[in-house]
Amino acid sequence: MKKFYIKKVISYISIIIISMFITIYMYEFYLSSKFLISQREHAIQIANKNKIAYDKRTKLENYKENLKNKNSSVVPVTGTDFLTTNIDNNELILSGISNSHTIFCNESGYWTYYESDRFGFNNPDSVWDKSKDIILIGDSNVHGGCVKRKNSIAGKLRLFSKKNVLNLGMSSNGPLLNFITYKEFGNYENSIVIFFYSEENDIGDLLSEIKVDRLNVYLEKENFTNNLKFKVDQTDMFAQKIIEKRYNDKNKSFSNFIKDFKYFIKLTRARKYITLRTNGKIKLMNIQDLKQHDTKSLALFFNLLNKLVLETNKKDSTFIFVYKPSREFYDKNVNIKLNRSKFNSELKPEIINFLEKQNINYIDLHKELSKRKIDMLDLYPFRIRSHFNKEGQELVAEIINRYINQL
């Protein structure tokens, strides 16, 4: 009788434990399904619902279609892919392939392309033959994502200011890569240097960049340079290797599957959700990792900014900091505790305070755009994509031009 009772208790306990595991993994599966739908897939759903034409080709499909049509002059944008592509090479590349028809991106339903300049940036090549009145540095928001060149911030600023605008923006750049890009390609005399800070990812990008020795050396050695202006043939060859690796990797899909599977087995999303929802009272993950920032990361950022301002001062240039809020900041459906981009908005007061203490010129885009009394989400493709649409980029260019005229 006693043995029977013990067996029954063990059986019940086993059922409870198994049920708990099943419930937890079902919850992880629910969160995975909820968060795995990409912005692209969501945009396509909205486009279909509103009967808006949408080019559903991925960048890989677009590129391979061009290769099939023997259009070898078309290349995908590379930029910082050198940091994530497993190539045994210590080369540094800050742009795309020079003088090429470049596949950019698609957020509004159509693919955008541009003819890269002599150094691989998104400019008319003639900008390099004139005085550099205005120099833009930043990530994809500056690069021109994802609109035609004439509708980008740089394109509209050329139109409004009637000045020569050099766009050194590149997708996925963080603050350190922007600093390096300025030192390699933008250190001209008597320019207006405009640095764009992207609230959604710049601090996280900086924390990743600072770990790369070939990037960190630019901060450690004041006069260090790779003289990339004189190595275009070399960097073009490196960029081509990156493209061949990324777009012909037959094991990429399997690698992504393994990565997602490990994510699932570790209950990553469930642990993250519970940790953030309880403000760390139930601590299943390091909450600092989820925040993506701490006192140290801000100190790194401020140190980099000081060095960048010092570099511009050496060239008798005027430095302007542009604070770009994340789209998620305006989306009421995004929970600040669960979204890293929205969470990063909590850093803003400290950043603005630093700028004011250091007497650094700055433009707060949220403050300026709010004066327009418009629905901010209307400035983003389908109200969900990461970059400003052409109307949003035009407004940003107007704001910057007005600020410059008041200097």
Please give the residue ranges for each predicted region.
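Generic structural signal for small/hydrophobic residues in well-ordered secondary structure
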Residues: 28, 139, 178, 193, ...
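Membrane/wall-proximal cationic-aromatic binding patches
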Residues: 39-159, 283, 369-383
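Serine-dependent acyl-ester chemistry module
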Residues: 40, 198-352, 360, 365-371
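Short, amphipathic alpha-helical "lid/cap" segments that border enzyme active or binding sites
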Residues: 175, 179, 298, 302, ...
